[in-house]
Structures are given as structure tokens and as C-alpha cells.
Amino acid sequence: NAEIKAMASKGFRNPTIREMYMFPPQNPDLKPEKLWNYELSFSQRLMDNRLSYGLNVFYINGENLIIRLPNPNGSGMLNQNSGEIENWGAEANVGYQFNPVWSVMANYSWLHMENPVLASPEHKLYGGVNFRKGRWSASTGIQYVKGLYTDLDAATKENFVLWDMQGSFKATNYLSFYVRGENLLAQRYEINAGYPMPKATFMGGVNINF
């Protein structure tokens, strides 16, 4: 079972009300973001669909990307259309189903940016394990991020490792319970400069489906 796909797409994004009018660094003169995206991908399933893998290469060319930059006509920061972007990269993934209960997966992405994009990492690697038996399910995974731009003006980058875990129990067809832990290694990191992300956090809840 092998599949090859080629795709070309054109897209745009209008600036949001928040970006234009709400709170600094708002800017009512923002223009829509526009881009062309080209992708070529290959995927295959083997061993009675227990093993799957894929590879994807892409090229993105766009203009008017909205980012936060120093105000050229005053102090502070201002949302601005930054001009053109030209990025390309590759993504790879693999997964294996040991049995109906256990499975593993991993993926890696590499991004080259001619013009750096805020909150976009150059390298991202993830590995995870999934468990599902009866009414119980659980998963855990570790993600490594390298070269994530948090401030384009200072070309500031972040590197960090995140470990997450979650589990759930389906009591009935309508009721389930879940728990989740994020950033269990309590990493100190930022996605946007000046806004530290939470350290280890835990949550739980109930889902009711009608």
C-alpha cells in the first residue's frame, strides 16, 4: 500500500480584530497574508498495515506575513506586514502497531527559513507510545524543539524538551474521565519573547457526550 501525492495550493489569511484593533501592538493598516504552498509526499503501509511511514517535502512562498516588530514611527512594538517569506523543508514519520493494545510513533521535521518566522522551529522531533485496552487509554510522548525563533528583531532562538502524558477511562457511551500532565520536566522556555510558558501543569475532567 503505497501512495504518492503532489499538491499546489494558494491561501490567504485576513488580519484578526485583535491584530488590528485590540491592545498593543494593534495596527489597523494590516494587509492580508498571502502564500503559495507546494508539497510532494510519499507514504506506505507494510506488514498487514502494522508498520506505516511517510516522507513529505514542501516549499512555501508568501508575502505580508503579520508579525510583531519594533514600531518604526514610535516606541514599543507594532503588528506589521513583514514582507516576503520563502521557506522549505521536509517531514518524516513512522508508526508501528505491536498489537491491539500497544503502538508507537515518531516524527521529525526540518525547516529552512530564508526569512525567519516567529514561533517556527528549525528542527522538531517527537516520539510517543500509545496504550488502549477496553475502556482505558493512555499515551505519553517527548518532543524536542531546536531553533525556535521567539524574537525576530534580536534573532533569539529557543531549544527545549517537553514531556506530556494523558489517560482516560470511558465509563459509559456517554461519560468519560481524563487526566493530563504537560511539560512534566518543568522546562523553562518561551514561544514568544517575554511570555514564559507554564512549567509542569496537571488537569483532569469529565466528558459528557449526548
What are these regions (language model features)?
Residues 115-119, 152-155, 190-194:
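Short, solvent-exposed loop/turn segments at secondary-structure boundaries
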Residues 1-3, 7-62, 69-97, 119-122, ...:
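Outer-membrane beta-barrel signature, preferentially recognizing the C-terminal barrel domain
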Residues 164-168, 176-180, 203-207:
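One-face residue pattern on beta-strands with alternating periodicity enriched for small/polar residues
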Residues 10, 44-48, 131-135, 171, ...:
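A generic beta-sheet turn/junction motif
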Residues 54-61, 79-150, 170, 174-176, ...:
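Gram-negative outer-membrane beta-barrel transporters
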Residues 15-24, 67-76, 106-110, 134, ...:
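Flexible, solvent-exposed coil segments and beta strand-coil junctions
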Residues 39, 197-210:
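Outer-membrane beta-barrel "beta-signal"
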